[in-house]
A protein has these predicted regions:
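Amphipathic alpha-helical segments
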Residues: 15-28
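Short secondary-structure junctions
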Residues: 26-32, 86-89
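N-terminal beta-strand motif that seeds the catalytic metal site of vicinal oxygen chelate
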Residues: 1-16, 65
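Conserved short beta-strand elements that form part of the metal-binding/catalytic scaffold
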Residues: 28-63, 111-116
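Vicinal oxygen chelate
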Residues: 12-14, 65-111
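Short, flexible helix/strand-to-coil boundary loops that buttress conserved ligand/catalytic motifs
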Residues: 21, 54, 79
């Protein structure tokens, strides 16, 4: 039986990634040990793990995740209020497949898309 999934994304700088996800997106760090080259963050029921990839070229990074959420309008506004740059092709909108979505690129150009089912 599958119970959870925790995506692992590349990061060039643990400090930069930590600060972005905590200060801009409202995540918090968890775990009792600071693992060299590895970062674990959590918000609500979502965990995202990051592994160090110092030579990553952000323009060549195709890391991406899709996060289902509730109250997407409020989440979108919080991102705007926190100065998060929304992806140019990813402003909040209803998609033909029945999801209300928005997307952003983190400092390493991992594409993070948030979506909520619309009735």
């Amino acid at each position: 039986m599958l119970t959870e999934i925790h995506p692992k994304l590349p990061m060039r700088s643990k400090v930069l990634t930590r600060n972005y996800y905590i200060n801009k997106l409202g995540f918090h760090e968890f775990g009792n040990i600071d693992h060299p080259g590895y970062l674990m963050l959590k918000k609500d029921h979502i965990q995202i793990h990051f592994f160090e990839f110092k030579t990553l070229d952000p323009k060549e990074n195709y890391g991406q995740i899709y996060i289902r959420t509730e109250h997407i309008d409020e989440l979108y506004q919080q991102c705007l209020d926190n100065g998060v740059d929304i992806h140019p092709n990813g402003p909040l909108q209803i998609k033909p497949w029945g999801q209300k979505e928005f997307a952003l690129l983190d400092p390493d150009h991992n594409l993070i898309t948030f979506g909520q089912t619309v009735s």
